[in-house]
Amino acid sequence: MPEHVVDLHADIRELASWLERAVQLRDVIDAYLLTCAIAQVMDDWAEGTDSIPRRLTALLGDGGVARRGVRLAADIGLARRAVLDGREVRRVRAEVDRLVSRLADGVVADAEAGEHVMAEAGASVARLARGLAGLPSAVLGGLARPPSCFRSFDQHPRDCVELARRFAQQHPDRQRAGLLVLGVRTSGAYLAPLIAASLRVHGFGRAAAATARPGGPLPAAALAAARRGAAKGAVLVVDDPPSTGGSIAKIVRSVRRHGFEASEVLAVYASFGGEPARALPEDLPRVVLPAAEWHIRRLLGGARVEELVRRALAGQDVVDVASDEPGLPDRSGHLGVRVTAWVRDESGVRRHELRAEGAGTGYLGRHALEVAERMTGLVPAVYALSDGVLLRASGEALPASAVPADVMVGYVAARRERLRVACDRGSELRGRQPVWEIASRIFASGFGRLGPVVRPVLIDPLLRSALTSANPCLTDGTTAFAAWEKSAIGTVRKADYEDGFFSHLDLACYDAAYDLAGAAVALPETRPALPAAYESAVGEPIPPSRWCVYQCVQAWNLRRVGAADGDPRRAQARALQGLFGQLFLGDLDDEPTGPWCVLDVDGVLELDFGGVPATTVAAMTALRALRAHGFRVLLATGRSLPEVRDRCTAYRLAGGVAEYGGVAYGAGDGSVLDLVDGEVWGLRRDALVGELARSSAVRIDPKYRWCVRAAGLEAAAEAAHPWFTAVRGDAQTDFVPRGVEKAAGIRALLASLGEKDAPVTLAVGDTAMDIGILRMAERGYAPGHAGRALRSAGVARTRAPYQAGLAQAVGRLIGHRPGGCARCAVPRLRSADRLVTSLVSVGERGRRGIVPSMLELAVLRARLGRKAGPWT
């Protein structure tokens, strides 16, 4: 077995080599797919798809002076590229186009005609190989994007044939000037030539194919050819199944601006059920293949499945085969059916539980066989693969909570060892949402509207380098979803081992630690133990910042796909808490025994970081100073009990008051002190929840048990209740039982800790709900951003806002700037740790912190430019 597994993010040299092999084997499907991949790489290079100007254009959205300026810069760069290198590239690209068209004819034809096409293809491929060898290295090094249509979505070439038939049936006029099937890259680049070839079979002799990306240039020559002649031409815009239809809509609008009438531009696509593609123009003519008519459903029909089983078990006495009726394909994963086979041997008739499911077309699906072979014992046994349908062993589905942590760690470590690749190509996947690019989007949140400008220039290069793996492998990518099965003999196997990498969800990453982070998000109770177990298995620790970033991206993905299980925002918050706690407090072993300090959370200890609460460098430096100088810290917050518990664990705090004083938590023994009358309060709370729930727009946070936190309340928030005080926040309204108050909660908590009369030396809060704790403290401070209520109450304010204000308050208490003495100095952080914590901390000084943060990033970027290879 080769040392390295096949990487479908292949460059042109690899694609050309595989193409020559496909021609030798007379494999028309693979030859077609590989030639399309070469075309895609060349087109993306010619259009500068992944260049910084193009990416900035996309990030800046529609319109505006900035976007027009960046677009002009991109066009100038492409013009220069076309003059210097474009002639030879265009010549070879024309050769590729002719080969794609001819191979598409072979794919849609019958077997005999396809064989004839392949017999003729050898000379064309040899000529193409010679041409490719002379291309610039920038073109040869471009990477293929596996098409979602034939990799993730179970589309089949026969679906393209059927779409062409439906168009021909609806538009019988074969005398059109020309038909251009315009594919939306990437998937459209694979679908369009097949539809065009099928249209030629139906008598549309001038049907041709071309491709474009939304926001990119249109193929002007191909569009002009479609208009040539007296009769009207038409443009058929094709893509994989649209969710909103936004990509198709952009291309359609561009084509209409090119001079085509609305009736001359059509959308052609296969559809998932229940996705209305709302972004498509209402007047857009469409040719749609509904989910019920996809070819995969025929391939998974009873007769086809039985035939596949009998071929796979040839030589055995197969008594009978039964399978479920296939459902409808959807975006969540490959369509599959349960299969039961009864096989007779010397001991009698045995029952075998199997599953037949889509895997992908041609070499894109065959990749699953190689991965399964290398991962033997950890994934289900595979018996056959035919025409994009894989037959494998099946077992009982397991929930995430039932998967032992050691099994998860073993699986991740095995992928790291068995699925090694030659290099980490994630850094070359700009514009394709690899993990580092999504991490950049997440960690640019502090820059607000400047984020799209800062990301490509400063944040992207830094995170791209920081997340490059020294031991690259093909990751699973779906460990946060935990699709595991248990066999009849009790072994646990990863069922969707091939669905994540190279998928429509993107998120390419070559670091096995990313898969472990998915497990941490899915199994939060095992999260603390996973890094150590992984280090023990592979002999290498996971750097703290990398572990945090990977968890944040996994949580982001759970939010994106709308996962029903878990709490992605809380998972991301935990990841950030864990990073800051480890870096800033991990070396302070001695438990403080000195005076008490009370801190609010939101706006004081933490800020809003893209919709997720996060602490900052200033706040943690202040917290470190308090701990190092012997002060004990309690939290007083409106957040829920589970969230207070998370922070006490991460920040090593003695306890806290949650839900505005409704409940207190002692971290030492895990005690919970209920501070609201139970029975009466429960009835009143239930009544309020029922009242709020009458509005379908209202969302009740289930973590809150004493107060009621409700979002989506614009009108319902006015639902006054005599037993509650409504506290309006930026994104929610909290209903607090009357009489519940943070200061009383702190007193009760101190009493439960055996410190009933202990004074509070310092308190910091920023809202009217904090006035009680600020007045009870010997030193009560509000950060500089605090509102009018605290000013009216005469509370002392710091000059700086937010977490920088907290640091100033702590400095006044200890007599020097936090971190300014040997006792509380912050340990030296590694470059990657400093990068991530600095990105989270951009807002700790309000808007005044943005420019200094950009300068700090520029310095890091300059240092990176002088250093070869990845850095940590």
Regions found by a protein language model. Give the residues of each.
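An alpha-helical support segment within catalytic cores of ATP-dependent transferases
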Residues: 421-476, 487-488, 571-590
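Conserved ATP-binding subdomain of kinase catalytic cores across diverse folds
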Residues: 334-460, 481-482, 496-546
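Helix-rich C-terminal or lid/interface subdomains of diverse kinases
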Residues: 440, 444-448, 517, 532-584
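PRPP-associated nucleotide enzymes
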Residues: 1-332, 396-404, 420-424, 850-857, ...
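Substrate-recognition element of Asp-dependent hydrolases with the DxDx(T/V) motif
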Residues: 181, 623-647, 697-714, 726-731, ...
